[in-house]
Amino acid sequence: MQIRHFLQFKDFDRLEFEYLFDRTRWIKNEFKQYRRYWPLTDRTLAMIFEKHSTRTRLSFEAGMHQLGGSAIYLSTRDTQLGRGEPVEDAARVISRMVDIITIRTHEHQIIERFAENSRVPVINGLTDEYHPCQILADIFTFIEHRGSITGKTITWIGDSNNVCNTWLQAAEIFDFNVHVSTPPGYEVEPERAGLYGTDHYEQFVSPHDAVKDADLVTTDVWTSMGFEDELDTRKNDFADFCVDAEMMACAKKEALFMHCLPAHRGEEVDAEVIDGPQSVVWDEAENRLHTQKALMEYLLLGRISVR
C-alpha cells in the first residue's frame, strides 16, 4: 500500500474525508457501547512533540491504545532532534522502528522534510501554519449537530493562525464559506489567501458583520505558543474581538460555537458563550479522539468495510 501522510487538510479529497467521517461514526459508536475494536494490534505510534499539548497527546495516545496498539511519547529532550540531529536522519531511523508517527512542531517545513524521508505515515499534530486534525474533528462535530457543512458560513474571529489557515483549506474541499475578522495587522496573509482562492473566503473589519447569518462561530486564543512575548500587545489589539452573547446574537439563531481549546474566558470568549447552549466545544474536543482513530486506521490499513 502506498504511504500516505496527513500534513495539510488538502492532502485528502472530499471522498476520503466522507469515508473518514463514516468510519468515525462507527468507531465512536463502538467506543460508546464498550465494544472492543483492535484493528491496530501490535502497531506502534511515535509522538514527537516540540510543542506542549494536552488534547493532541491524549487523543492520539488513548486512541492508539483503544485500537489495540501502543504509543511512545518523545519530546525534543528525549531525542537527538533537540540536539541538532538532521530531521532527515531522525526520520530514516524512527520510521524503521514504528508504524506511524505524529509530529507537533513549529515550522511546517520540518514535518515536510520528515515525511519525505519516512517509511511510514506521518500526521501533522500541529505546526505554526496548519492544524488539520483539529479541523477534521470540527467538521465532523458540525455534521453531527447540523448535517452537511456544504454551503454553510463559518466565521473565524481573532488571530489568523494555523487553525484559521486550515479552515480556509477545508472550505475549498467542502464548498462552504469562511468569514474572517481580525484586528488590523493580523489578517490572513495575501499570499496564503491566494493559495485557497477567494470564492470561499471573505475578510471583515467588524466582527459583528463577520458573524451575520453564520452557521458556526469559532475562535482561538489571542496569543498562540511562540508569541508569548506579544501577550500584552495582543490583549490590547484584540480587545474588541471577544465572542460574547451580543456577537452570537448576530449569527443565525441555531448557530454553533466552537473553540479548539485551551480557552481563556473573558478574553477571546465569554463564559456565557463557551458554557452556553450554542457551544459544542466539549463534543468537539472528544471528537479529536474518534476522528484521529479513523485517520490512523485509514493511513495504516486503507479502506476497510468493518460494520
Swiss-Prot record:
Stated name of the protein: Ornithine carbamoyltransferase
Single Gene Ontology BP annotation: citrulline biosynthetic process
Per the UniProt record, the lineage of the source organism begins with: Bacteria, Pseudomonadati, Pseudomonadota, Betaproteobacteria, Nitrosomonadales
Cell compartment(s), UniProt: Cytoplasm
**Which Pfam families is this protein grouped with?**
OTCace (PF00185), OTCace_N (PF02729)
Q: Which PANTHER family match?
A: ORNITHINE CARBAMOYLTRANSFERASE, MITOCHONDRIAL, ORNITHINE TRANSCARBAMYLASE, MITOCHONDRIAL
Reactions catalysed = carbamoyl phosphate + L-ornithine = L-citrulline + phosphate + H(+)
The gene it comes from is argF
Statement: the UniProt record of this protein carries the keyword Cytoplasm: yes
Q: Which domain of life is it from?
A: Bacteria
